[in-house]
Amino acid sequence: MLEASWEKVQSSLKQNLSKPSYETWIRPTEFSGFKNGELTLIAPNSFSSAWLKNNYSQTIQETAEEIFGEPVTVHVKVKANAESSDEHYSSAPITPPLEASPGSVDSSGSSLRLSKKTLPLLNLRYVFNRFVVGPNSRMAHAAAMAVAESPGREFNPLFICGGVGLGKTHLMQAIGHYRLEIDPGAKVSYVSTETFTNDLILAIRQDRMQAFRDRYRAADLILVDDIQFIEGKEYTQEEFFHTFNALHDAGSQIVLASDRPPSQIPRLQERLMSRFSMGLIADVQAPDLETRMAILQKKAEQERVGLPRDLIQFIAGRFTSNIRELEGALTRAIAFASITGLPMTVDSIAPMLDPNGQGVEVTPKQVLDKVAEVFKVTPDEMRSASRRRPVSQARQVGMYLMRQGTNLSLPRIGDTFGGKDHTTVMYAIEQVEKKLSSDPQIASQVQKIRDLLQIDSRRKR
């Protein structure tokens, strides 16, 4: 009877969670017992146990209380024969090897002289302890850690997808570093799809296909970047299909990175799409404001540079969609201050960070006027304390666009809106960023105002 109640809990969770979330985390979880309000579950391994505790315990608890009809406390244990222990997971080193031996990391095929043009070895900066985890990347980071610790088991392949400059390559190479740190003898191969294709063409021309296959199919861990570029390349897809199968059958871990999920890669063979989707697809999205600030703070610490909080907020508010651009902006700011001798302040750094180098920006009044026009409110209402929905929405959008289109710091933007606190401005920016991906009406209104102000042409995001 109690087990039947757990099945009802699972059924309810299946209705309320996405299919990937349910299939990955809830379905493999086993019922152990329920007594005196204590619900005990068994996770297949330590990673799943930690993930359930951190991300689903409250959801499971609330659902179980509805089914069991009483207060419930959820306990998650690890299956007795699980090969991965919590102790190993938490204490394993994550630092990169100081030097990789020539045979340990293969990133070009140079050992077989297939390519004259080679890719670099794993970037020493791309390790787990230099990756800032936020809501945008938590699942991908956790999956990458799980794969690095226990390759070839649960998530094979691991398919990491997301836009340009969001950390896919960082996570992918961090997996390689981790494996080499705990197993220096591991055969780790990092390759771009372009290099795979070029090596294939060269092998065909030189009649060295067996050498090509031996090299790519010998890896314990293969990391393939930009797999979306395989689209339309029929012979490359054919060869990669057989390479994939050989590696998977041998228990080797496969990690793929793409700017889109498999289902959105055009002219991709159905069988490859199926293979790419058979493990775990983890997406990395643009970081929110707090995560961007944390990224800047961490990079500043690595560079041993002290930054005032308002400058961190300013840069984080100006570069919203690409971590490379965000870190690049900080690098330019540090170099600019070092060369000119100017202090690291918003006033001294802001003009230098104009993406087009033109120093052209909209004025606060222009932003207020255009936002008021589109939202059918007045600038005075936006500066007031009114909490009417149309006014509060317009105010938030105004703060967001003023941050994008002007050089004003958060406190100064707050002053423009009637003396609002800088934390109110931060919250407004955060809310608009969320709504841009979930509320088509807000997205349309924001784009209309951008067009009216020509913010896009003046300031690329």
UniProtKB/Swiss-Prot annotation:
A Pfam entry, by short name: DnaA_N
Species of provenance: Prochlorococcus marinus (strain SARG / CCMP1375 / SS120)
Listed InterPro entries: AAA+_ATPase, Chromosome_initiator_DnaA, Chromosome_initiator_DnaA-like, Chromosome_initiator_DnaA_CS, DnaA_C, DnaA_dom, DnaA_N_dom, DnaA_N_sf
Protein name: Chromosomal replication initiator protein DnaA
NCBIfam families: DnaA (TIGR00362)
PANTHER family referenced in this protein's UniProt entry, alphabetically: CHROMOSOMAL REPLICATION INITIATOR PROTEIN DNAA
Entry annotated with the keyword ATP-binding: yes
UniProtKB keywords: ATP-binding, Cytoplasm, DNA replication, DNA-binding, Lipid-binding, Nucleotide-binding
Primary location recorded for the protein, binned into one broad class: cytoplasm
Gene name of this polypeptide: dnaA
